[in-house]
Each structure stands twice: as structure tokens, then as C-alpha cells.
Amino acid sequence: MNVTKLNLNAPSQGDPKELQTHFIVNKNKSQYVKFPSLQDRNAVDSFHEFLCKYNVWKTTDRVILTEKSFKYEPSSCFSDISFMITFYDIFCRAKEESIKKQKEQINIVKPNNYPTGFQHVHVSQQIQHDQHPQYNKHPQNNHHPQNTQHSQNNPIDKNINESENKEDLSDRSSDSANSEESHNSQYSQDSGDSRNYQDSEDNKGNIPTGKKTEQNKLIVQRLTNPKITPDTINDSNKDSNKDLNKDLSKNQSGESIKDKSKGPSKNLSKDSSKNKSKETSGSNLPDKISEDGDDLDDLGNDIDNFMDSSDYEDSDQDAISENPSDFDEDDSDDDDSNTEILEQILEISDNEHMELSSDLLEELNKKSPSNSKKSKTNQKLSQSSKKISSKTITNSGSKSQKQEPSTFSVKLKGKVSNGKTNKKTGKNIEESDWENSQSDSDHSESSDDSDNESDNESDNESNNDSDNETDSEIDDDKNNATPNIKLIKKSKKLSPKTPMKPNNKTTSVSKPVSKPPVKSSIKNNTKNNKPVPKPIKNPKKLSKQKDQSESQSDKDIDTDSENLPVSKKPPTNKSQVPKRPVGRPPKSVSLPSSPKKPKRNIGGSKTAKTQNKSKSQPKTNGSKTSTKSIPGSKAVGKKKPTKK
């Protein structure tokens, strides 16, 4: 534990007893904290309780009590505290300061509140409204202080503004509508026309649409023509209300309203004009309506009558009762059904005084059958598209299978792009297809190879037995299997390491491979020792010749693989490897050396049974081999030393 002196300066004035007791906390051997307020043992206990609440310091830390002045070192009276000490004094002082700051912020916010500026504006508005008693009657219009200036200057604008304000408020809520009625009743009592106003409100729902449109026309004329005063409108409204009370069914009242609205009216007071302008505004009609309002209302009435008529319902039932299958069978049925529907529409239009133009009828006749034809053609197209899509799927699958060997061969030839080989070497792809067809169909190959074996056996039955033939076939497999492995290893070594020559090897890749298969097939036939035209008379020499043929055939294939062009190596197809029979030993699982070999080397000729025999049976009859291996081996043996 580190005990250090207090780093405080002595007080300038006063006794050192003022700062008599202090605590020094040694935290992490470097930080020292003072607590000048803890002067008693009771203070230490209270401090202990405080620290127990918050659990801040470790048990290894200690509290040092000093009872001397600053100039002296602290005494050795230590009290171990089993907790960690926080800055108790600093905490208390910070708490007091935070409380003071909060109080100061509250006092600062009060005089500078934002709503004070708005309150002054609002008070000024209230003073203006108090000066105008009109708006005291209408407290809802207090949010329009600009209307006061216009209303004092123009009485017409005053009435318009009042009516517009009332319509807006009536649409917002039902309370505003009730307040309008109360205020309107006050105006009507002042003018003495309250009875007419109540009658007009009772008859608002009974006004037909034609008369409403006439009233709206007058309002539009009043807005467009400044010469027309609201008195003329009020006269027409008053007379119309009287006529409606007498006879609502007569249509001549509309004409009388028009005639009376043209005449001048001079006897009505200003209060009555206000009342009548409010009557028009009370009926929730817009102020501005187009001059074609009569035509729209008449057309709406005709449509309502048409919907209510019995002919319309009968026509719907007739159209629904028809079988939907009749419309889909033939185009002639569609034409008949369309003509029937058009006749029904014409009858309905004659009854309801509606006219259809000849152009519309021609368009209906043209459109209806064409739509049915389009639907049928769309169905046919959808079916044909499904068939085509199924064909394309099968074709794409077959093409992808056929193009696999070509892409693999290109990788071995020298990393040439797939597009060039597919465009230029069309024949190369066909030959690889021939190989894939043989490798995919193992059963067909085995059947073909059985026929070839039967032919070869018929040639060899005169000199050899059936046992000798099976042994010779097994030996041929071994002779053919081991050189294939060497070819594949060398081709794998040559293909990645050979540098790309831009002109020579790409031309060798792009050349068609249709001509070389003839020569290579002749060489492969000589190597594989298949065409045996001549029988052998001395079977004793076969064992020696067999050993020579194995060694020479290995050398031949090594030198031939070096002399072959690059285009003859790639046919080692990885796609053909998993299709080999399972029982073949790992040495014979090799890939074919060239794509030009006949069917027998690709893999279906020998079954798993004969291959298992090749593992199990020893070479008992080494001398009794078939005559296939001799002529090829002799010929190759003579050629080799000259090439080397």
C-alpha cells in the first residue's frame, strides 16, 4: 500500500484545524482522492453505508485517516473498508449543483417562451372582433379577420362571403349546421320574415332537380354579371317557395321563376335580402355550377328511370338465361347473340327516349365477334407455346449432352474458347456424338460386339479351341489396357504445360477431324490386332512373340503419342468414365486413347464375368493365344528402329 502526503496547499488565513481530518484513497496505486468533509467516525460510518449501496470500490482498497495539518504525513491509523469508495463529497456537491442548474433553467425558460408572441397577436385579433358586433354573433367566423374590410365596402361581397363560410362550416360538422340555423333565425326575426324562412326550410327536400338547377343558374349569372343584384335572386326564390307550397307537381313554376327573376325588385329591405341569400346558401348546393346543369340533371333522371324500368330487368334476365356455352362454340352464335342484345338495347332506348347512333352499333358489331376470336386464338397460341416449350426443353437437354465432349476436348487442346470450336469444327461435334451414342448405350454395344466376336470365332475355329479364344481375348484386354493408361498420363502432362502458340495450335484445333480418323483407325487396328485374315500354323512361337508384342506395343504407343497432333489427344472424355462396368480392375478403368477406335475399345464388349476371369485365372495357356497379336506386332517392330 502506498501512503503519500496531501498535495493541498496550506490555508492562507486561519488555523490548520479547519482542515483537520481528511481521507486519502489509494486506488490502483496511482489515483488519490481527498474527502475533506469527513471529520468524524460517524461520518466514516455513513460513508460506509453509502458505499455499500453502490458497490464501486474493491475490498483491497483502504481509507487513510489523517488528524494532522497538511504539512505532516498522515498517521498510521487505518480503517479497512470491505468495499470500494466512491467520490462521496464530489457526488454530494455535484448533486447540489445540478439542482441549482435545473432551477435556473426553469427561471430562464419562463420569460422567453415562444407562445408569448402568439398570445399578443391573438389578443389583437380579439380586440378587433370586439369592435365589430357582427362577428360576435358568429364566433365561428373569427378565423376570417380579413372579411371585415370587404364587408364594409361591398354589400354583395359581404353576402357572398357569409354564404360561402356557412357552406364550408355546414359540411364540416353537424354542430356548425345547428349554429347556422340559430343565427339565420335571428336575422329572420329582425327582418320580420321568419315565417317564410321556416316554410322554405320545410320545403327544401321537396324541390325538384330542375328548379335547383335554375336557382344555380341564377347564382352563376350573379357571379358572372355584376349588374344582377341579389334582390333579383331573392325575388325568384321567394316566388318559387310560394309556388312550391301550392303545387309541387307543376313544371310551369320554373318558367314563372325565370320571368319574375328578370323583372326589377325595389320594395324589399336589406334584411330580407340577407335572409333570402342565406336561404339559397342553406341548401347544400355549390355556388358555381356549369350552365349545362339542366342537361346533366335530365340525363341523371333518365338513367334512374331506366334502372327502375321493367324492360331493363327483363333484358338482364334474358341475357343471363342464355347458355354461356353458346357464346364459345362458333363465331356465328356470337353474332346472333350480339344482334339479340342490340335489339333489346334498341327497344329499351326507344321506350326511354334514348337514341343510339349508327356508328356505335357498327362498332359493337365489329368488336364483339373479334373479341371472341381473339380469345380463341390466344388459347391456341398458349397450347402451341406449351408444346414448343416442351420440345425446346428436350432439344436443349440433348444438345447439352452432345456438346459436353466437345467442350472437354477444347480444354485439353489448348484452352481455346468454346464459341470458336462450336462454330468452326462442326464435324468434330458429330464425331463426339458418335462416341457418346456408343458410350451411353452399353447394352447395344454388347450385342454388336457379340456379333463381331461370333464372326471372329468362326474364322478361328479351324485352328483354335473355345478355351484358347477366351484366353486370347483376356490377353488382348491387357495389351490394350496398359498402353491406354500411358497415353492418358502423357496427354494430361502435355496439355496444361504446352505454351499456347497463337497460329499453329489453334488451327490444329479448328481443323475438322473428319479425315484423320481413317488413318488413325488403321493404326489402331494394327495396334489392337483385330483384323486377322491369316491363321498361324506354329502355335509354339506365340509365347515369345507375345512378350515381344507387349514390349513393342508399349514403345509404339509412346512414340505415336509424341508424334500425334494435338487434335488426336483430347478424346479422353471424363463423361464416359462412370459408365464403365464396375468389376474392371483399376488399371483397365483408363479412358480411351483416341475417339477413332471402334466399338470394342470403348467398353461394352467384355462383360464383368470375363473381366473377373482376367483377375482370377492365371496364364495357363501362354503359348495358345489367338492369331490377332502377331501381324501387328511384327509390322510395328520393324518400323520402330527406323523412327528412332
UniProtKB/Swiss-Prot annotation:
Per the record, the domain of life is Viruses
Which regions are flagged for Polar residues bias?
A: 175-191, 216-233, 607-630
Where is there biased composition of kind Acidic residues? 292-301, 310-338, 447-476
In this chain, composition skew of type Low complexity spans 133-155, 367-400, 496-531, 585-594
Q: Where is the composition biased (Basic and acidic residues)?
A: 159-174, 192-204, 236-249, 256-279, 544-558
Which residue ranges are recorded for the region named Disordered? Answer: 123-644
Q: What is this protein called?
A: Uncharacterized protein R627
Q: Organism, per UniProt?
A: Acanthamoeba polyphaga mimivirus
